[in-house]
């Protein structure tokens, strides 16, 4: 617990100026187009809560991704000070939210150590948010303030009482700043996992309301536990080596944890003051130097180099190594604003000295583990030598082939890699269609026979001797392995995996992705790998055939068919609503139903569909008990009418004591088991609810007694819009035959070009890695040697599978 317990407006130091943020957001938060800036918004808010935890006042943080892509971050810290700031004349909370570089971390006494990726504070998040709602629980009171684009809508005000404490920030990023507002679970989970390991004992709950997924990140044991986590499902060669030292001579703190495993991949993570360095830097250089020197000294001292007649390198030492280097530096220097590379020269000396000292002691004190590590290093050197010989053999064979390219490859005429595409296709039949259907100028085709080697289980020299892998490496042209690999020699910057939509196709795609992830991850990082998306359906109507790409396009096609020659009549005598007007109404209805489906993990659709037909509830109405009671009676009447055998609904009002609101709550009793759903203030304030009530107003004024729909000569009386739409859809599908489509070989060359290869109409998925640690574990679990973790994975995820097609 911190010694200075006074945390009020006097702790908040101000460095002014916020206008520049809206003009040049990239300087403050990162790229606003590729998602990095968007996710930094969350990290800036979370870092404030982490600072509270480091000071000893916060133990729980929750992050919620809402269905409308807004975010709530809540902690149980002290709560931001609410008293009036002497310099600024407004509440300290408003200063923190509206002034750049204002906060406790600029006052040396409040936070001794603080995170912060860009160190710009939550005010930048506020400036770049369409709306931000700040809720503070402090001194048994609840305070609230709302901002639009950083502008306060009213002064901080007291809204209720509470027993808890802490800060809650709910924000919706501004579409004026960010071109794509979609939060990635993987990107958030990656950083939160790092923070929870680097800050032992703090529980961080990540919850995604879009999918229902949630995970608690809470780890004791710091970096040692982090290494053990990274090596899950791998066989460890040694116990985790770990040290943590604070140097007095230069004030640098060095913590290292490492462990070798039986895989062939190196996994090194570097941090400075809790911030990750993707490109390493001086701390990594110092670590590598000390590691290689110590191991080579040990090999020399034991006489192993002469015995095995082999020379080892630093690369051999790092095969199968998982290590984390974390340094605490008073004033770190980085190569750029994004802090991806540390350049402080004194850190190299610090890490090299401490690592050299502690690791030498480890090798001397643990002779059995030292022998196991060195044995693995010598095995790696032997495999490297075997791989070199295999490469030379491949080269000699290749010299006989024209230009050294595999005979199977149908190359393209274009020599600029940025304009060239390589289609990796499954089998010769699809390869034949693809070769005939392609654009020869820019599209090359490489058919692979059967399933390529699973590189997760194979050593490097065995992998090189595999014919299909060798063919692929030669076609790509960039080489493989540390000595040979050169991304600049890659012959295609668009590598497209095109396999059938069946089990074998999925397996081949997974084997190829395993190869790229393990051997050429840079191709994925640069966005060169794609997966082709052939159409899912073929629809026949009379003599007409049409390919349809996915379920959404199928629904659109069937809706068009249903609305042909169709009309909706408000009553018996009214003219019909048809054509574009009817299509617009159907699309609006479908949009609302899609919204309700998206919300259904939180609020069951069987309840929310009634809101279309009920009066609109405003946020102000929630404070009026009698108004809410009247609305509830109408809601209960509809629920009672919808009850089925074994299922009953009971609606009531629940008081929110913090804010003095009356919230509708429904008890669902299914076969004697009760579950409860509460519709909270955020639900009624959301754009989603607004769209439901607007559609309701439109539909409720539309249908009268005697309403009907008509298609051609056929009529159907209706009492609800849904009944009419369902009847029209059923009528529209009658004369269609629908074929679910699986194999590429089923298409002729012309169809393959039109649907899957023509750059003007095709759809492709770009392969990305947003959470490398999670990706590593998935590949290890699904493609590795251990069977038990794979069975556990399948059992725990089986129920989440949709569209299982085997």
From Swiss-Prot:
Binds two Mg(2+) per subunit. The magnesium ions form salt bridges with both the protein and the DNA. Can also accept other divalent metal cations, such as Mn(2+) or Ca(2+). It is found in: Cytoplasm. It catalyses: ATP-dependent breakage, passage and rejoining of double-stranded DNA. Mg(2+) 2 binds at residues 500, 502. Keywords: ATP-binding, Cytoplasm, DNA-binding, Isomerase, Magnesium, Metal-binding, Nucleotide-binding, Topoisomerase. GO terms for cellular component: chromosome; cytoplasm. Pfam families: DNA_gyraseB, DNA_gyraseB_C, GyrB_hook, GyrB_insert, HATPase_c, Toprim. Residues 420-535 form the Toprim domain. Its main location: cytoplasm. Its EC number is 5.6.2.2. InterPro entries: DNA_gyrase_B_C, GyrB, GyrB_hook, GyrB_insert, HATPase_C_sf, Ribosomal_Su5_D2-typ_SF, Ribsml_uS5_D2-typ_fold_subgr, Topo_IIA. It is an enzyme of class 5 (isomerase). The record marks 451, 454 as: Interaction with DNA. One of its GO terms (molecular function) is ATP binding. Its cofactor is Mg(2+); Mn(2+); Ca(2+). GO terms for biological process: DNA topological change; DNA-templated DNA replication. It comes from the Bacteria. Mg(2+) 1 binds at residues 426, 500. The keyword tRNA processing does not apply. Few gyrases are as efficient as E.coli at forming negative supercoils. Not all organisms have 2 type II topoisomerases; in organisms with a single type II topoisomerase this enzyme also has to decatenate newly replicated chromosomes. PANTHER family: DNA GYRASE SUBUNIT B, MITOCHONDRIAL, DNA GYRASE/TOPOISOMERASE SUBUNIT B. A type II topoisomerase that negatively supercoils closed circular double-stranded (ds) DNA in an ATP-dependent manner to modulate DNA topology and maintain chromosomes in an underwound state. Negative supercoiling favors strand separation, and DNA replication, transcription, recombination and repair, all of which involve strand separation. Also able to catalyze the interconversion of other topological isomers of dsDNA rings, including catenanes and knotted rings. Type II topoisomerases break and join 2 DNA strands simultaneously in an ATP-dependent manner. Belongs to the type II topoisomerase GyrB family. Heterotetramer, composed of two GyrA and two GyrB chains. In the heterotetramer, GyrA contains the active site tyrosine that forms a transient covalent intermediate with DNA, while GyrB binds cofactors and catalyzes ATP hydrolysis. This is DNA gyrase subunit B.
